[in-house]
Amino acid sequence: MRDAILVLNAGSSSIKFSLFLEQGQTLEPDLRGQIEGLYAAARLVSKAPDNTLRAEKTWPQNLKLGHEEALDHLIDYLQAHVSADRLIGIGHRVVHGGSIYTGPVRVDNQVLEVLETFVPLAPLHQPHNLTPIRTALARTPELPQVACFDTSFHRTQPDVAQMFALPADLREAGIMRYGFHGLSYEYIASRLTELDPTAASGRTIVLHLGNGASMCAIQDGRSIASTMGFTAVEGLPMGTRSGCLDPGVILYLMDQHNMDTRDVENLLYKQSGLLGVSGVSSDMRTLINSDDPGAQLAVALFCYRIRRELGSLAAALDGLDAIVFTAGIGANAPLIRRRVCRDAQWLGVEIDAAANAQGMGRISTATSRVAVWVIPTNEELMIAHHTRRHLDENQSPQGERNEARSSASSA
């Protein structure tokens, strides 16, 4: 019987899950799915790697299933349907590890308390990321819970790339540029090594374009600079997040529009970005297909900001060898890729129209000085690998894995 690792990625209204089985030195996906519609009409959907339906269940809306109850049902489902006695650990995506956690960590109540102090730095994500950990610690305390952070990958950046021009005491207090989407960038860097070793060992800019969007300059697999900083609201305009903003705007809003910190937070995180500019939608698919002038303006601003950040990140790399598009928009919006690459012709970018329309693999021409790739990300697999490696490196012959097997068997 093979060991299994469960990966959880909790959002505000859903818990996404993936189960991986050990196959020698590799991890094979066994199932994936989510419980969506939390606090409304919750629904569990589980699928096999070939996308065939494994299980489906809907709860009455009046139950208003929350994160804790959803995780209870998920654990029950795993135990009943996928031999959960093999489960040796749970890996969790956690957006912010601060300056304290620069790699995966096994979470206990003490670590959980520290992670809760980072909630103000990632208010849209961190509270929901931590809820399943808290529930799992209470229900299966002997089963290892491993937190994997979106901030860790960026700790290889030079000091100047992580600094704000603020007094040293504030920097020492942890006010710095952390960067995010690190699990995605780490996966892309690893995958690019397999697909294009020359590009992977050179200077690459990865565009993680989704409802949350950022860009990262990577050299020889290491983060050099990124567009997100202290929080995940900086950088590119996103679905509902503003992206870069003159701090003076915030002071002005507070002084002249009587906005308090909660008002400003709500504005920057939930009312701005593509939604705020367009007045139509936060969904890029809707905006691309809309004739509304506001929608067209939002798309134009999104591409313009990417154009500026490409130049900035290419400068940080002293040149450019490859561009990779990933995440929901990056992997599925040929129009955005075409506009971005058209604006990057000065860097030596030239894409093949047919390859771009197909949207998989290398989409640049044979004569392009910069290789351009479309690579779907897989943060869940990255978390599973980190979890297994952490358990392997932090065990004795009678250590964590044996405890986990014993705990899972008796759960």
What is each residue range found by the language model?
Residues 266, 273-277, 284-316:
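Adenine-nucleotide phosphate-binding core of ATP-dependent small-molecule kinases
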Residues 219, 224-260, 266, 327-358, ...:
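Catalytic phosphate/nucleotide-handling subdomain of diverse soluble enzymes
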Residues 296, 300-321, 330-399:
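Internal helix-turn-beta structural module
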Residues 5-7, 14-63:
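Short glycine-rich, Thr/Ser-proximal phosphate-binding strand/loop in the N-terminal lobe
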